[in-house]
Amino acid sequence: MKRFLLATCLVAVLLWEAGAIPAHQVPVKTKGKHVFPEQETEKAWGTRAMEPLEKDDQLRALLPVPKQKLAATEEKHSDTMTWVETKDILSRFRNPLQGPELDLDSIYHPMSEDVQNEEVPQSRPILYRQVLHGPEEDLDHISHSLEDSGEP
């Protein structure tokens, strides 16, 4: 239990230092005003949420940048940084090819006529027929013992 509490405190301190947990920007107690703390928190978060993402460099690396915006920022920062254009790897699923599929049967099946015309000998299983004359012999004693039958 002590280790869990210590680990939780350590994670909280690391997140606080990294800036993941925002500091309290609005005091809970105000002088002379009767304002609910939830409203002040919403105002504080609203202003934080409206700030542009350019100020937050941590999120810029995670979010995809549109190509128009990429070209505009490339002109501004061409001397300091070089931008790599992102490739849309899902475009073939969003825009499927028109027309029939390619015929790829030749990969798995040979195309030569000699192989196709050649008949493969098929072996048929030999069925043995047993003609019974009269009633069938009782073979239950092989799989069932007398003890299992429950007869005295």
Swiss-Prot record:
Highly expressed in the small intestine where it shows a proximal-distal graded expression. Keywords: Endoplasmic reticulum, Lipid-binding, Secreted, Signal. The keyword Ion transport does not apply. Its main location: secreted. Residues 1-20 form the signal peptide. InterPro entries: PRAP. It comes from the Eukaryota. One of its GO terms (cellular component) is endoplasmic reticulum. It is found in: Secreted; Endoplasmic reticulum. GO terms for molecular function: triglyceride binding. GO terms for biological process: cellular response to X-ray; deactivation of mitotic spindle assembly checkpoint; DNA damage response; DNA damage response, signal transduction by p53 class mediator; negative regulation of apoptotic process; positive regulation of intestinal lipid absorption; positive regulation of phospholipid transport; positive regulation of triglyceride transport. Lipid-binding protein which promotes lipid absorption by facilitating MTTP-mediated lipid transfer (mainly triglycerides and phospholipids) and MTTP-mediated apoB lipoprotein assembly and secretion. Protects the gastrointestinal epithelium from irradiation-induced apoptosis. May play an important role in maintaining normal growth homeostasis in epithelial cells. Involved in p53/TP53-dependent cell survival after DNA damage. Interacts with MTTP. Interacts with MAD1L1. PANTHER family: PROLINE-RICH ACIDIC PROTEIN 1. This is Proline-rich acidic protein 1.
